[in-house]
């Protein structure tokens, strides 16, 4: 699923590495939902629970959450750790296009 949905995607993918117990992750969630709706034709947005997907978290060296990673053409092209306002996340996504 990760391979097809993220690495082979024909659009950029914004992945949110999070945990249910993480306060800043919960604050970020509605922002990511808004971005997913606004850019639905041009961007995929996904979430990875680091407690349930430890292998993926280790693969992308997630040491702090929330961590956002933008993938394009199968490669991680931008990363951000911690809470960020919507404008910064949108700029990070646009910069990766």
Predicted regions span which residues?
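Non-catalytic, surface beta->alpha helical segment in thiol-disulfide oxidoreductase systems
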Residues: 64-97
